C-alpha cells in the first residue's frame, strides 16, 4: 500500500477484493482500503476487474453526504487500491442485531438518508442497481451512505438495453424478474421499499429462492398485477402467468404497527407499473416525512453494541430545542 496509509487490520474479503482498515498518516483519519483482486482475462480490462473501473469512474464524478466517498486511487502495475471513507457498520448488521430496537424516528431517518443519496444519483442519471441492507453503510455519527457501485450504470440513452440480471434477488423489481432489458429509476425505488419493510419486520419481506418463487412471494403479499394495472407486463421477455398462493391482504395486515402514511409510501414504491412507481423526489414529498414523529438526530441512530460510539452531548438549536432532520416543503 501507499506509504501514506498505515494498515491496521483486515476487515473482510469479497469476490473481487480484500478490505483493510488503515490510517491516513496525513490527516490522522481512519479509512477503508479496498484492494482489488486481479480479474480473469474474460472479466478484466488491462488486468483490472471491470467492476472496479466502473466504480472508480462513477465515484470520481459524484459527491454527496449519503454516498460513500472515494478519497484516493492507488495504482501499481496490475493491482489497484481504492481508498474510501471508513464506516463503522452496515444496515444489515443493525437489522440483525436483536438488542437494537428500531423506533419510528430511527426508521424515518434511515429512509430519508437512503432517498436523499439515491435522489442525487438519479438526478445525475445513475442507477445503483444493487440496493440492499449491506450496501448501506453507517458510521458512528449516524450518517448512512450508499456503497458498492460495481453494478451502477448511467441511464437515459434512447433505446439502450441493459442486463436484467442485476440487483440481489430479494430486492429485485418485478420487471427485472420478467426479463426487462429497458428500465429506469423504478428498479432502485422498489429495492428501497423492500429495505423499509425489512427495517419494520427485521427479516426480508420477499425471500425468494428462484426468480419464479420471488414473483410468487411478491404477488402473495401485493396481489397479482393485471393488464389494466401494468399494461406492458405481458410483452416482457420472460413473462409467465403466476397465480398467488394466498388470499390478498392489505399491507396493514403484514405491518400492523406501521402508520398509514408509511404504508402509502411503501405502496407507491411497490407499484407494479414502473412508469407509475414513485420517484425519490416524489417519495421525499410524501406525507410520511411531514408528520410526527420526525426523524431522530443522525447520531441517535442505534449501532451494534460492539461498535457503539461513546455518548455525545446533544446539540441544541438557537431556541434551546433539539434539532430534527426535516425536509423543507416551502
From Swiss-Prot:
Disruption phenotype: RNAi-mediated knockdown results in an arrest at approximately 50-cell embryonic stage. The phenotype is more severe when done in a cdk7(ax224) mutant background where the embryonic arrest occurs at the 1-cell stage due to an arrest in early meiosis. The keyword Transferase applies. Changing residue 280 to T: In ax224; temperature-sensitive embryonic arrest at approximately 50-cell stage characterized by a severe defect in the transcription of several mRNAs and a severe decrease in ama-1 phosphorylation. Keywords: ATP-binding, Cell cycle, Cell division, Kinase, Nucleotide-binding, Phosphoprotein, Serine/threonine-protein kinase, Transcription, Transcription regulation, Transferase. InterPro entries: CDK, CDK7, Kinase-like_dom_sf, Prot_kinase_dom, Protein_kinase_ATP_BS, Ser/Thr_kinase_AS. Its EC number is 2.7.11.22, 2.7.11.23. The modification Phosphothreonine is found at residue 163. Pfam families: Pkinase. Residues 5-289 form the Protein kinase domain. Residues 315-330 have a biased composition (Basic and acidic residues). It catalyses: L-seryl-[protein] + ATP = O-phospho-L-seryl-[protein] + ADP + H(+); L-threonyl-[protein] + ATP = O-phospho-L-threonyl-[protein] + ADP + H(+); [DNA-directed RNA polymerase] + ATP = phospho-[DNA-directed RNA polymerase] + ADP + H(+). ATP binds at residues 11-19, 34. One of its GO terms (molecular function) is ATP binding. Residues 305-330 are annotated as: Disordered. The active site is at 130 (proton acceptor). GO terms for biological process: cell division; mitotic cell cycle, embryonic; mRNA transcription; positive regulation of transcription by RNA polymerase II; regulation of cell cycle. GO terms for cellular component: cytoplasm; nucleus; transcription factor TFIIH holo complex; transcription factor TFIIK complex. Catalytic component which, in association with cyclin H (cyh-1) and mat1, is likely to form the CAK complex. Belongs to the protein kinase superfamily. CMGC Ser/Thr protein kinase family. CDC2/CDKX subfamily. Serine/threonine kinase involved in cell cycle control and in RNA polymerase II-mediated RNA transcription. Required for maintaining chromosome ploidy. May phosphorylate the large subunit of RNA polymerase II, ama-1. This is Cyclin-dependent kinase 7.
Amino acid at each position: 500500500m501507499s506509504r501514506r496509509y498505515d494498515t491496521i487490520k483486515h476487515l473482510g474479503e469479497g469476490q473481487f477484493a480484500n478490505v483493510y482498515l488503515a490510517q491516513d498518516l496525513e490527516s490522522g483519519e481512519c479509512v477503508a482500503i479496498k484492494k482489488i483482486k486481479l480479474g480473469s482475462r474474460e472479466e478484466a480490462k488491462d488486468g483490472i476487474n471491470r467492476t472496479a473501473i466502473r466504480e472508480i469512474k462513477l465515484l470520481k464524478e459524484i459527491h454527496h453526504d449519503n454516498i460513500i466517498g472515494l478519497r484516493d486511487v492507488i495504482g501499481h502495475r496490475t493491482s489497484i487500491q481504492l481508498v474510501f471513507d471508513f464506516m463503522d457498520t452496515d444496515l444489515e448488521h443493525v437489522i440483525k442485531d436483536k438488542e437494537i430496537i428500531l423506533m419510528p424516528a430511527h426508521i424515518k431517518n434511515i429512509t430519508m438518508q437512503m432517498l436523499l443519496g439515491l435522489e442525487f444519483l438519479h438526478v445525475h442519471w445513475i442507477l445503483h442497481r444493487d440496493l440492499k441492507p449491506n450496501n448501506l453503510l453507517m458510521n458512528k455519527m449516524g450518517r448512512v451512505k450508499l456503497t458498492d457501485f460495481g453494478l451502477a450504470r448511467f441511464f437515459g440513452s434512447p433505446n439502450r438495453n441493459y442486463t436484467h440480471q442485476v440487483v440481489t434477488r430479494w430486492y429485485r423489481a418485478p420487471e427485472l424478474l420478467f426479463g426487462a432489458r429497458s428500465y429506469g429509476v423504478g428498479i432502485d425505488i422498489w429495492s428501497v421499499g423492500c429495505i423499509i419493510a425489512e427495517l419494520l419486520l427485521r427479516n426480508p419481506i420477499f425471500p425468494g429462492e428462484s426468480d419464479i418463487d420471488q414473483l410468487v412471494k411478491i404477488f402473495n403479499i401485493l396481489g397479482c398485477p393485471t393488464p389494466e394495472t401494468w399494461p406492458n407486463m405481458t410483452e416482457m421477455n420472460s413473462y409467465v402467468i403466476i397465480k398467488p398462493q394466498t388470499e390478498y391482504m392489505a399491507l396493514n395486515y403484514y405491518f400492523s404497527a406501521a402508520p398509514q402514511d408509511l404504508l402509502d409510501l411503501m405502496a407507491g414504491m411497490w407499484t407494479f407499473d414502473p412508469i407509475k412507481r414513485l420517484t425519490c423526489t416524489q417519495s421525499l414529498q410524501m406525507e410520511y416525512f411531514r408528520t410526527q414523529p420526525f426523524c431522530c438526530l443522525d447520531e441517535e441512530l442505534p449501532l451494534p453494541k460492539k461498535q457503539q460510539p461513546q455518548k455525545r452531548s446533544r446539540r441544541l438549536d438557537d431556541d434551546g430545542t433539539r434539532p430534527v432532520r426535516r425536509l423543507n416543503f416551502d
